[in-house]
Structure formats: structure tokens, C-alpha cells
Amino acid sequence: MTPDELSVALTACLKAAVEAGELVVPTEAVPAEVRVERPKNRDHGDWATNIALQLAKPAGLNPRAVAEILKSRLEAIEGVAAVDIAGPGFLNITLDAAAAGALAKNIVHAGSQYGENQALTGQVINVEFVSANPTGPLHLAHTRWAAVGDSVARLLKASGATVTSEYYINDAGSQMNNFGASVLAAIKGEPTPEGGYPGAYITELAQQVVRDHPYVTELTDEAALPVVRAAAYLAQLADIKETLNDFGVHFDVFFSEQELHSTGAVEKAVDRLRGQGHVFYQDGAIWLRTTDFTDDKDRVLIRANGEPTYFAADAAYYLSKKDRGFVEKIYLLGADHHGYIGRLKAIAACAGDDPARNIEVLIGQMVSVNGARLSKRAGNIVELRDLLNWLGADALRYSLGRSPADSPLALEPEQLQKASNDNPVFYVQYAHARTKAVDRNAEAAGVDRSAFEASLLTHPTESNLLAQLGAFPSVVAEAAKFREPHRVARHLEVVAGTYHRWYDACRVTPFAGEEITDLNRTRLWLNDATGQVLANGLDLLGVSAPERM
């Protein structure tokens, strides 16, 4: 029996008690779901709930009296061995060994789908992250949201949501002209222009542009600039996509800002916002009255010279997401974009949406890497490509995903490269590799999964391991709900530690000369269930699950 199954049974007991008149409480006081938690002291049972304390006041009863009503119904559930009332009214539930152990077989049968849930079924969500300017290589500032954003999207999908991962390409505006001018200057052997982009990567782009378009060297600057800008942009965007792919980060859509301008979407967005009654004219410019919706100041949409602002493109982009059917739009932004929260929520409100429901802005803090070398190729930055070559995608993805994104993070490369238990990614991956080693040893010894007797899994380390495996779907659901992949990483570390202790205490393969029993076969199921949970969790974090280490 999984914690979720027990939760369903407990919820049914509560509703039955209310329907039978044993508990008289207002309808709104009855929770849709009664959750169970692992007690800190295992002497207090396998699972515990404080539902009796929650319902005592609306029921007008002592918490222990509420607990007594639920206790009698819980004891009748198949698989529940005992129910005890502790303290002011906590319900401590002990499962019989067969009910607890059956989980191992269920996990193996579920395979890669174990941990998936329907908590967000029906939600259509757009997750936008990274969205770095296509004027240079990805660097350290982009790494955290690349890792976290991809994992958030995976978690949302695992919880039943329909999710689109999106990268907004800032390919419009003066920065693109400066970028193109920088590459053109490199082609001509001239210094970087004022406001341009330095670095060896510009020279590399210049060489590639000349290889692909040799005729540009014969054009005037005016004629060459648009050709060079377009070619260099495509080459740099291809480099960004390749780096993201090597980092294990997937995007469904790369959305061009320039397309908003070329298709007239920006002008149409201004007209739509005008129709909502929030546009006004001042000093020859067109403004959006965002202060009506908690923004700190009103924002210019169209300058007095007729040029749209970047904010106008932001508004058009939001409306594009809305028109494409995304009910919830999640933006993952760096700490330097904190001021965007108010203006983005104001856009949503001006568009007739509910900022509390239709838009969510997550702010991440900066990451530093001790000992990281600045890129000579890209100037005064640490390139993501260099970090991948140095630390590897797995170590980088896991270390970025295991800490809350809203806290500053300093990575220690020396620790991430250690093959020891104080390296979290090694610790978890090694646990998975160990489950595969047990599989190989079991096969060599003739132990298979031809029998399964859940009631044999009675060792304390087995009940502990089963409890952690059973908690995995709830951890996934909570991580998706709060957009916090680190919850999965930290749980995997608990699973790994619990598994290692079980491995030390319980043998799957018998000693030489000993008979193979159903206990050996059943423990193989538990071993494989653990490997499946570790693999599924690592996949949610974008990290590989090696079979050998």
C-alpha cells in the first residue's frame, strides 16, 4: 500500500463517518484529501495524520474523540495492521508486512511511470526560461535557470499538466545591430565598434560568415551589415541550441521577438490593450496604465517617435501565449529582473487575465563556481560550454537542481568531481549503479523474480526503504506544485542512504552453498523497485542513471 493509497482510504473513512452522522462538520471543513506523513519515530507506526486535530474545532469535539471515530473505521481497511491514538489526537497507522511490501512489485510493474500523478491534469502551462540574447554564448548566469527550468517542466508533465517549454529569442532592437556591426568589423579587421561585442567568438563567427557568404567582403558596409547580422545570428543561435542539448535541456518552442514586430503583433497588442481601457496618451507617447495593477509606474508602449518599446514586445509576447491557449504562463527570471514581476503581472491584468492565476514569475539567485576560469573566447565571463567540459552535465545539473533556486549558490568543483559519499550526485548515481550490480550478481547466482511474497519483507531496513519509495509520488507532486526540483533531489538522497543501509543488512544473493528462497526473490523485487525510483527521479532532474560506476 502506497502513502497515496492510504491517503485515499483515510479520506474515504472520513467522508463515510460524516455521511453516517458520526462526525458533524460543515462541508467546507472536510478536506478533499487527507494526507499522511512518515512519523519521526518509527515506534509510532508506518504513517501518521493530524486530521483529528484539524476537525476537532469544526466538529465541536475533543481531538481524541474525533480520532476514536476514525480509528474504528481505519482498522477495518485491508492491509492496516494497527491504529493507535497518540498525544492530543494523532493517528498512527501501522501496515501489515504484506500490504507494505506489495509496493515493491507495483513499482517494478509501473516502471518509468512510477511517480507520475494527476495533480495538475487539465492545466495548460507555458514555461519560459533561459531566453538569453543570441549575441553571445551561454554563460554562468544562464546555467541555473537552464537546469531548474527544464526540471520544472519535467515535473509539471509528470503531474499531468500539458506543458510547453519555451525560449524567447531577443533578436530585435539595437543589440542585434551592435552584434552584426561587431562581426562585420572583425571581418574587415577593424576594432570592435563602440557598444559592440568583444571576444574571440566574434572572430570565429566572422570566419564562419565569410566561409558561408564569401561575397560579403566585396559589399559596402551598408549592404553587408544585414547579411552579416542574419548569418551571425543563425550561427550563434545554433551554438546556443547545441550547448543546451549537451546540457540535457529541451525546448519545444524557440519564439522570435523579431516575429512579433514583422507580423504586426506588437501594434495589434497595443490595440487590444487600448480596447481594455488601460492605454493613454502623454507627451506624444502611448502608455499603459500599469499602476492600476500594483506596478510602480506606468509604462511606455510606443515612444513619441513611433518606435515600440521593449515593454510593448513583452505585452505582445504575453498575448501570444494567451492566444496559443496557455492558461498559466510561468516566467523564470534572474535576480536582476526582479522589477519585471510587477510589470508582467500588470500586463496580464490589463489583458483581462487574473495575475494570481494566469501568470507566475520565479526569481532565481546567482550562481558562482569557485576556481572557474574566465573564458578567453568570450571575454570576461564563464561559459556554460566550459563548465560542461570541466564538470560534466550530470554533476552540473544535479548540483544546480538540489538547492532552492531563490537562494545564492556557490558550487565547489572539487567536491563535484569526487567519487565519494560527500558528493551528492555520486552518492545517488552510485546507489542506482549498485542496484544494477545486484541484478547482475543475482542473475549469475540464479536468483530471479519468479516469486514474490510481500509478507517476507519484515526487516526494519526493508520497511524503511519501502516507506521512502512509497513517498516518491507525493514528493514529485509537491515539487511540481511549488516549482521546486530540489525536493526530488533531496528525497533521492534519502532513498539512496536508506537503500545502502538495506544493502548492508539484507542479502539478495545467498551465500555459496545456500538455497535460493522466496525471500531472495522477493528482495530482488525490492532492489529493482529502488533502482526504478532512483532512475525516475534522476530523469526528472535531467541526470543520467548509470548502470556501472
Curated annotation (Swiss-Prot):
GO MF assignments: arginine-tRNA ligase activity; ATP binding
InterPro entries, per the entry: Arg-tRNA-ligase, Arg-tRNA-synth_N, Arg-tRNA-synth_N_sf, ArgRS_core, DALR_anticod-bd, Rossmann-like_a/b/a_fold, tRNAsynth_Ia_anticodon-bd
The protein's Enzyme Commission number: 6.1.1.19
Keywords: Aminoacyl-tRNA synthetase, ATP-binding, Cytoplasm, Ligase, Nucleotide-binding, Protein biosynthesis
Class in the EC hierarchy, top level: ligase
Chain span(s) of sequence motif 'HIGH' region: 132-142
Keyword DNA damage part of the UniProt annotation: no
Gene Ontology BP terms: arginyl-tRNA aminoacylation
Superkingdom of origin: Bacteria
Reactions it catalyzes: tRNA(Arg) + L-arginine + ATP = L-arginyl-tRNA(Arg) + AMP + diphosphate
Location in the cell: Cytoplasm
GO cellular component term, pick one: cytoplasm
HAMAP family to which the protein is assigned, alphabetical: Arg_tRNA_synth
Family: Belongs to the class-I aminoacyl-tRNA synthetase family.
Quaternary data: Monomer.
The protein, known as: Arginine--tRNA ligase
Name of the gene: argS
